[in-house]
Amino acid sequence: MTEGIRARGPRSSSVNSVPLILDIEDFKGDFSFDALFGNLVNDLLPSFLDEEADSGDGHGNIAGVDGLTNGHLRGQSAPLSSAPFFPEVDGLLSLFKDACKELVDLRKQVDGRLNTLKKEVSTQDSKHRKTLTEIEKGVDGLFESFARLDGRISSVGQTAAKIGDHLQSADAQRETASQTIDLIKYLMEFNGSPGDLMELSALFSDDSRVAEAASIAQKLRSFAEEDIGRQGASAAAGNATPGRGLEVAVANLQDYCNELENRLLSRFDAASQRRDLSTMSECAKILSQFNRGTSAMQHYVATRPMFIDVEVMNSDIRLVLGDHGSQPSPSNVARGLSALFKEITDTVRKEAATITAVFPTPNEVMAILVQRVLEQRVTGILDKILAKPSLMSPPPVQEGGLLLYLRMLAVAYERTQELAKDLRAVGCGDLDVEDLTESLFSSHKDEYPEHERASLKQLYQAKMEELRAESQQVSESSGTIGRSKGASISSSLQQISVTVVTDFVRWNEEAITRCTLFSSQPATLAANVKAIFTCLLDQVSVYITEGLERARDSLSEAAALRERFVLGRRVAAAAASAAEAAAAAGESSFKSFMVAVQRCGSSVAIVQQYFANSISRLLLPVDGAHAASCEEMSTALSKAEAAAYKGLQQCIETVMAEVDRLLSSEQKSTDYRSTDDGIASDHRPTNACIRVVAYLSRVLESAFTALEGLNKQAFLTELGNRLEKLLLTHWQKFTFNPSGGLRLKRDLNEYVGFVKSFGAPSVDEKFELLGIIANVFIVAPDSLPTLFEGSPSIRKDAQRFIQLREDYKSAKLATKLSSLWPSLS
């Protein structure tokens, strides 16, 4: 039987004689309609398939015929004969009708089976639902039973816990009562006769039960002391009942505790000698019951070799100060302290390991140890190197002075601060090691500002004495210097030195560094910095002011020489030497003062730069401190400015005096009124002009170098104005003809060219007006009225110059000008 169709018997050529049988199993699984259809029709179409096979390649097969391999008809068909084109159509129709009928029957069978299954499923579902409902009811009942059971268990547990608590409390009370009985028994033993410790229980003499004995003794003493305290309070209230107290017990307990403590300390020391850390730890633990173990801690620290060995202290001194009798330097002391403090830190670190292994409270022991190190060992070496000097009679500078003490103090403070940090890292418990370190220097820091200012004053005085000694030595070695050259010995030897001012600043900067080190609070730091900087301002102000005054003295000496020249000029023989001396003195003093001014400016710039770089930032955090220091700096330097101003005025007087001398001595009356002898006019400036310009160029070279900015402009402007007035006054002494007027114009050109280097517009303008006025000597008399038509402001000066014309009277210029310029008549 093939897939999809089962034949009941052999099949004939007539397809209607044999019905089809379809099985429901054919429709299960991977059902294929094409396969079912092919199995139905393959037996009815054999001739058609053969014709298709014989028709040759290229036509192909009827779609679906080759694939109809499933199913077959019952019986074999007869060979096809020549008949109609598709004779199997009737057979196929009959086949399809039978197939449809059987398919309908199969569907009815399937529907019947489905209805039966649905009924069975419904019945089973009802049974399951009923079963689940019953199960849920059972579970709910079970949960209720569990809840009741849990409540019962909790109740029983609470009852058991209460019973346990009662039992524990009863046991504790029993234990307490037992201990109390024992304590009362022991207390009665101690409350026997005073000082009698021979009848005590074996517990108090058994070395193996020392810890227990110590604990009981402490409890008994506490109880006895409290009882005595209560009796004392009752007696004070008037409710005391006469009776014997526990005073004897307290005394005996105290004696016993002292004896036991000493015994434990002895055992602790013996174990310490053997480095038996286990026994040491046991003793320390027992001793902790006596005053929290303070005696054991202090005893351990006090017995350290670095505190009891005299050689350790001597070694410390040699390490820091060197050999006996040598003068220690701060650098050597710094190295020595670093080495010593490193050794101390290493020793403390080793002790820390032992303390941690031995004591139950190592932090407390470390606090005691570090405190002892700072207060004994460090303080001992600090006392050796920091001998506070007296401000009334300070040590001389040759022996280091106050500066040596301050440097030692700074070095010691820095190294001790580093030691404190190292000890803090090792461990020092609750000890405030930084605060303790500060307390070691409190007496020094309290008076530090006074010592710092006194040191700066001492350094300044020593420097001034050194400069005076050098000046005197040079003066004595040089012998008597003649005054003919006009040199001032004191001025030349004591000129302002920028190097000296730099030393002042260097001292102050070092002091500020120490001040920053010792002053932790901003307000304190600002106050100390301000005071120290004020010392620098005073020193620089006094030094440069005195230097300027010495330079002014040189100018005054030159002025005195000029006075002697004026007095002696009537004597022809003495006039020349006096004039040379006055000129040399004036020029030398001028240059010396300009050098002083230049160095003064450089010194002030150094101070101002130092203030901006180092001082300002330390004062800004405190309101008003920076402004106050700026005002003090301005006030201090104003004294030097006043001295410089007076000296510059004297310089101008000196220059003008020499210019006046040169003009008076070198200017000839014939320079501006040459005779008409047929000789060509001289186109050169006059000799007096050449000498004056050469002198001014030479002497003012130092002024151009020394002065700058507004100071330079003001000085040269004043000098130019004074020169213009002097020339006006000088030229009014002469009579001018046209040739002399041309000579004057050449002089004026020289002067104008020189004063242009001043960079002073007002001076240039005045000299240009002089050039215009000088034209009155050149033009013809008839041209004079039109000469100043555009410049009415200079007519008055022009009239004075017109009067100097050689032809002023002969040409009756006065009458002509009075009619033209009536306001000038």
UniProtKB/Swiss-Prot annotation:
Disruption phenotype: No visible phenotype, due to the redundancy with SEC10b.
Coiled-coil segments on the chain, per record: 244-266
Any single GO CC term annotated in Swiss-Prot or TrEMBL for this entry: extracellular exosome
Listed InterPro entries: Sec10-like, Sec10_HB, Sec10_N
Keyword Secreted found: yes
Superkingdom of the source species: Eukaryota
Compartment(s): Cytoplasm, Cytosol; Secreted, Extracellular exosome
Record key words, sorted: Coiled coil, Cytoplasm, Exocytosis, Secreted, Transport
Membrane-spanning residues: none
Family listed: Belongs to the SEC10 family.
PANTHER family reported for this sequence: EXOCYST COMPLEX COMPONENT 5, SEC10
Function of the protein: Component of the exocyst complex involved in the docking of exocytic vesicles with fusion sites on the plasma membrane during regulated or polarized secretion. Involved in polarized cell growth and organ morphogenesis. During cytokinesis, involved in cell plate initiation, cell plate maturation and formation of new primary cell wall.
Name of the protein in question: Exocyst complex component SEC10a
Gene source species: Arabidopsis thaliana
Gene transcribed to yield this protein: SEC10a
